[in-house]
Design a protein with these regions (language model features):
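Cytoplasmic helix-loop-helix junction between adjacent transmembrane helices
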Residues: 103-139
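Helix-loop-helix hairpin linking two adjacent transmembrane segments in secondary transporters
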Residues: 128, 136-181
């Protein structure tokens, strides 16, 4: 194993462990709903609070050029440790919704230091094969996001202990960063603080179109991740019970989300061989089709529902890394970290709307139609990437493979 791939392995491990914080509360929502008497709005709020905190964290990071002015490694480990602390505080000392919302918001702010800086560190190790490398990193993020569902699905741990397990995993990730993760030989030039760069990185058409493609992807992704567990549980209830090939809804959710790591790997390979725009358009077309059709399996044969959900879980994340890779290839080198952070901030702002939208849609139109509202994202994303492909600047992508 080369040094670059060893570093990618370590960075991916750290990211997997750290991102277990993200959906830790979402994984225990049924228990929280029973104990605290949560309304659907309150349950959605616990997920949206993390998104909102992440947005604020990435916005502050972008406005201060934090990942370009300071060591991305330092930003990453500090963010992970603080996120673990806020998550553990919820488990240890919170007994009602509003303090939980505040701490979930704080966890989101801290996680802004875990994700974008990791992409920048990885980019210092890879020029060739960067799409595959970022794909593997996002795959680790995917498995990490699903981990609380695994803990909940295969153990009898109460919800507080489940959150503490997630915090312990995150601290282990910070230790990996501290002891073994380093910057690579292809370092981006240091930057001085310049508040204008947070917006200026998207002043040119090509990065802006890549960002629009990313927005379409994000409209769909986090709403699916947030509510697929509820969909799978409700589908079994509608049928009168049963399981997904012996798996309960929580364990099935872990399988659906975690298998997205395969999509990240395949998407990375396809992107480096076929080009960024081609691979992202294919992935969004497939995931959009799944969003449009999975509702028709609701209450039907569990294996059919699980199969469509797995295909959706794989294709919905397959393109994610390629939008980030495109930004690293299209943006000014000195401000790649700021560009990634700004893109991420805008994308996560949009997820708050789609996450909030699903519960009222499910209540009014039923689960059969709720996820269909997500198809607009990949449809517009395909259009944006097709327009990017037609620009002269797209020749910078993948060494000329658009």
């Amino acid at each position: 194993m080369t040094r670059a791939w060893r570093q990618l392995t370590l960075l991916s491990l750290a990211e997997l462990l750290a991102l277990s914080l993200w959906f830790s509360a979402s994984a225990v929502l049924p228990a929280l709903t029973r104990e605290w008497g949560l309304t659907p709005g309150g349950a959605a709020g616990l997920t949206i609070a993390v998104q909102a905190g992440f947005i604020v964290g990435t916005l502050l990071s972008a406005l201060t050029n934090l990942p370009d002015v300071f060591s991305a490694r330092t930003v990453m480990k500090v963010g992970i440790v603080l996120g673990a602390a806020t998550n553990a505080s919820l488990a240890l000392w919170v007994f009602s919704l509003w303090p939980a919302l505040i701490l979930r918001f704080a966890t989101g702010v801290c996680l802004a230091g875990a994700y974008p800086p990791a992409m920048k560190i990885m980019s210092t190790w890879f020029r060739e094969g960067r799409g595959l490398a970022i794909g593997i990193l996002v795959g680790a993020l995917t498995v990490g996001s699903a981990t609380p569902h695994l803990v909940r699905g295969v153990t009898a741990l109460p919800w507080r202990e489940t959150l503490l397990v997630a915090s312990a995993l995150a601290v282990a990730g910070a230790i990996v960063v501290q002891l073994w993760v380093t910057d690579g030989p292809y370092r981006f030039p240091s930057a001085r603080f310049d508040i204008r760069m947070a917006a200026a990185v998207f002043g040119e058409r090509a990065p802006r179109l890549a960002c629009f493609g990313y927005l379409g992807h994000m409209w769909e992704l986090y709403a699916m991740w947030a509510w697929i567990a509820a969909f799978l549980a409700a589908s079994l209830e509608e049928r009168g019970g049963g399981s997904y090939a012996g798996l309960n809804a929580s364990a099935a959710t872990f399988v659906v989300v975690a298998l997205g790591a395969l999509g990240c790997w395949a998407g990375g390979l396809a992107s480096d061989r076929l080009g960024r725009t081609t691979s992202t358009m294919i992935a969004m077309a497939l995931s959009g089709a799944c969003a449009a059709t999975i509702g028709f399996t609701f209450g039907g044969p569990p294996l059919l529902t699980l199969l469509v959900a797995i295909v959706w879980g794989i294709t919905i994340i397959a393109d994610s890394a390629q939008f980030s890779t495109a930004i690293t290839e299209l943006s000014p080198p000195a401000y790649v970290g700021t560009a990634l952070t700004t893109q991420t901030c805008v994308g996560f702002a949009l997820t708050m709307i789609s996450i909030w939208l699903i519960p009222p849609m499910a209540a009014r139109a039923g689960w059969r139609w709720a996820f269909a509202t997500l198809t607009i994202g990949p449809a517009l994303g395909v259009l944006a990437m097709a327009r990017l492909r037609a620009t002269p600047e797209s020749a910078k992508l993948t060494g000329g493979r658009r």
